[in-house]
Amino acid sequence: MGLTRRLRPEVPMHLLTCVPAVCALGICRGLREAGDADACVRWPSDVILGDGSLICLGSHAGYEEGMYVDLALSLEGEGADPDLLERAVGWALGSCDQWEARLRAAGTVAGPLAPVLEDYFDALEGSNQEVDVVYPNGRVAASGVLAGVDVWGRVTVRCDDGREMDLAPEMGRVRPRA
């Protein structure tokens, strides 16, 4: 089951890249406030519920009568509550509105996640814990501790061999170490 919503945040185009992450953070916050203390964001922008269900966020940005981001939400998992997606959309839109207001109030920011960076990192699955870095082909590239995220949404893993590895979403994913 899924839903799609068009968002038109009034922010500079280069800041739109993090809209899915900002929306995932809002959904995670909403779930936690609703009693799901184990909800977390799977980097970069999916949300894991405490029961193991997953809210997947996808996006497509474009320009048609102004800039937009189409945000697609889908719910995966047995026993998933279909009404949850509607509530998730509300949480996502509210988070995007708050983010937009904070960007506007700040004037100039280092990057799109700057206003929510600490909250986003704290919500990430595996933050400050041992993780594997997995390439798109499924090969484990490195193991270490998920040490940070930057204002553009790239994660930093402090590898077991002492080096630091920065990872953009298109380069792979991180998962808790088995």
Language-model features, listed with the residues they occupy:
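Short Gly/Ser/Thr- and Asp/Glu-enriched loop/turn motifs at secondary-structure junctions
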Residues: 41-45
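Primarily the active-site beta-strand->alpha-helix module of PP2C/PPM metal-dependent phosphatases
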Residues: 1-8
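Long, positively charged amphipathic alpha-helical accessory segments at protein N-termini or as interdomain linkers
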Residues: 8-39, 49-178
